[in-house]
Amino acid sequence: MEQSLMEKLTILADSAKYDVACTSSGASRAAKAGSMGSCYAPGCCHAFTADGRCVSLLKVLMTNCCAFDCSYCVNRRSNDAPRATFSPWELAELTIEFYRRNYIEGLFLSSAVLVSPDYTTERMLKTLRLLRNEYHFGGYIHAKAIPGTSPELLEQLGFLADRLSVNVELPSESSLKLLAPDKGRHSIFRPMKQIAVEGAANREELTLYRKAPRFAPAGQSTQMIVGASPETDHHILKLTEGMYQKYSLKRVFYSAYIPVAEDTRLPALDTKPPLLREHRLYQADWLLRFYQFKADEILDADHPNFNPYLEPKCNWAVQHYGLFPVDVNRASFEMLLRVPGIGPKSARRIWHARKQASLGLDELKRMGVVLKRAQYFITCRGFAGAHPGRGSAGRERITSALIDPTVFSGGVEQLSLFSPPAVDKLVAQGVPTHAAQKLVREEAVQCLARAL
């Protein structure tokens, strides 16, 4: 029986929920006369823009009928699930109707592999050509490039979309071979390299010809599944660092693995998604991009996984406590960035303000420094650094100031990094959740104090 448009939308929007796209668009194309939509300062997928607005997009698959059989994917060939496929005309018209009703401001288009990567990409191209050329849609479009797509089709896709992304999926080639045998390292990184090279060439061309067509003006991103394979956090972070450097990625997204199938190669169906691990990866990713950290400084062979109780930056400060305290009136900008409680904005404010006058605690507080954390790592005018005291009491005071409160306030599910979760174990023994969180926090503080 032929499916209605609403039935297709229900199936294909649900199938797209595992794709991550929570980011601002990064494009700055203004609206033109006779066109619909604008890319000026917006974001996508319920993201908050710099001016505080929350914008949305239609996130949907072209089809969930897949020729590949990736064991971790809900759309894999062997999965017994409802299937649907949009025609290019249906999807283009649906996007425009949603836009006219002010439901969305853009489109996030991905797809399972229907017949072959090239055949699927050709259908995506037809959809985007209809939107751009027939409907004159000027809004944000994020297109997922299919691994294995020919360079010619990928180039055409880049001139129609604002952002492209090729999902890495898994952190190592061995995991790809085990869990996604239809995909290979070359089929993923070749299009990544092409997007980076063509993007750089296009930017050069735009300096000479302002009206030259723009190739993926918002750059490229990728997504990695965390928890489906045995790689360490250090391995994942090194891969992330390499991709940022080699392929000029705008973002790397991390997705905590949600079990969707019973398979001996994958975690059991009752395994909770490693949400805390995903959160730590985003924090470390931020350090790579904005705090001038290297992956090997955050984690190493001796400490290959994140500390569940401390944010990566605080964990680094604890491990290198001998470098502190630093004088904020003399320290380098790079060292200011490494002080817990000081971020890029407050570091820049300190850097400029101290040229005019020596800074004290009052000035630092007005600049946004979180003194609860920073006080143990800095000195300034009239302040010789907080003295937490000697022995275990002093160490516990520092640890209590640094410990990540979200680990305990987020509930039992946030602790899914542990095996078994400490809070979960106490709750199973009859201890109330709030009391269990308090006990685990106290134990964590004592353990971290001993590490100091």
Task: Cite the ranges covered by each PLM segment.
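Long, highly charged, low-complexity intrinsically disordered interaction regions
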Residues: R265-L337, R373-A422, L426, A451
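Conserved C-terminal portion of the radical SAM core fold
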Residues: S172, S187-T264, P273-L299, V370
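Residue-level signature of tetratricopeptide-repeat
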Residues: A353-R354
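Flexible, acidic/Gly-rich N-terminal and inter-domain linker regions that tether
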Residues: M1-C65, V370, I378, A386-S409, ...
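Conserved Radical SAM active-site core
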Residues: M1-F68, Y72-T222, V226-P230, A261, ...
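Short Lys/Arg-enriched helix C-cap and helix-to-coil transition segments
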Residues: D362-R366, Q375
